[in-house]
Amino acid sequence: MKAIIIGDIVGKPGRSVLSETLKRLKDRYEAEFVVANAENAAAGAGVIPRVGEEILSAGVDVMTSGNHIYDKKEVIQYIEKEPRLLRPANYAPETPGRGLWLGSTDSGTPVAVINLQGRIFMPPSDCQFRTADRLISEIGARASVIIVDHHAEATSEKYALGRYLDGRVSVVVGTHTHVQTADEQVLPGGTAYISDLGMTGPHNSIIGVESSLVINRFLRGMPTRFETATGDARLNGIVVEVDERTGKAVSIERLQVKSASS
């Protein structure tokens, strides 16, 4: 099976380019499953119900997230009732939502999606390595195709988890930095890996934010209200092919698609 995995959707520009391009990409690659990180989808920080539904309607099957998941209070009730929106599984058990989705594609291929968060230069959370162990054991034979979104800052930490899970999951992707890396590969054990998917949003910006606002904060050191940039919207991500019988990745390809209106 082929899956498309999409980097952090940032604000309205990100949602617009997603809606514009995803169906075409699914047709081109014959992809039957789509995962997208949605933690910046509502005005650049967080998710609200209307935005979540917009992303699902565009053709996304599962939404992952990270440290901005609770930036909008409206998400609390939504994440409790919408199993297709994940929060990091290594958050405290009492935290609203869940970090594992287990289901199947339209053709019946069982798929699991795990959402994890890094701990280096990030808010406190439980160990993502041990959390992954527990969830893989919980999934067991119910799904051979397992996709992991590791929302983390440090590349070394991302690589470490990729190597740690090599051969036990199908795909490990990094998110969070909004900068697409060029290290896509199939690891020796058969796990597809990339350090960061990049950003689906306005690339005429500083990682999605209006450039002048970020520069002003660096120059003056004063608090500045960030606003999502506009223009040059692009979709970043990967398309990965997985042998659904073995759960091993066959190939991984980077995606960077510009909006026709940019």
Residue ranges, per PLM feature:
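Acidic, metal/ion-coordinating pockets
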Residues: M1-S262
